[in-house]
């Protein structure tokens, strides 16, 4: 018989808000609107620990994740998990019967690959986007979610263009959009990505033929923007399309400076 040291009373009786496992790599399949996505996400699962309890049962957290993932990849029940947030909620629900808690969080980090069409040659280019989904069970039993996307684009500087007869410097820009909302609110990650990507001077592509390169450069010079412009546009579009608390962060990797530029706002 094993000694359950986790159930002992700790020397310092302080409650902990988040205790669990992080950087757990696994596999998951999601059926979203008839299209199946396969992910290799990094998972983080945490629960609260009361002051009178020394620790948590780590194996039970992993077991809950494994069970939820196994259910998701079985063909006959794949449709049960229609989104990453549904998968996260399933992990929490399975955890409830294994590890008592008042509050729990599941965070899922992964990449979403979306096919895009190049601007001139009209070829298909598969573009990667960093996404993160958080599912939070509050102490009152309610659920909320946090959705984050990270998109790479570019900007052309309007100040240099206005002072150099149309010549300017260009740089890669990174736009991040976060939305915190009630769990029931439907917010597709793809739409969040579209909001960010359409706010740059021009989108970037993995595959570009010469005619596409020309189209991208011409598009950038026809649409010069400061990093502040990009942040404001993302924020305005997000407020128009989504309900929830919005956080926008844009970083411009400056090409003529040794520093970068940041613009950030939130609701």
UniProtKB/Swiss-Prot annotation:
EC numbers on record: 3.5.4.39
CC cofactor: Fe(2+)
Keyword Metal-binding found: yes
Catalysed transformations (reactions): GTP + H2O = 7,8-dihydroneopterin 2',3'-cyclic phosphate + formate + diphosphate + H(+)
UniProt-recorded Gene Ontology molecular function terms: GTP cyclohydrolase activity; GTP cyclohydrolase I activity; GTP cyclohydrolase IV activity; iron ion binding
Gene3D superfamilies associated with the record: Urate Oxidase
Keywords noted in UniProt: Hydrolase, Iron, Metal-binding
Pathway field: Cofactor biosynthesis; 5,6,7,8-tetrahydromethanopterin biosynthesis
Main enzyme class: hydrolase
KW Iron (keyword) present: yes
Name listed for the protein in its UniProt record: GTP cyclohydrolase MptA
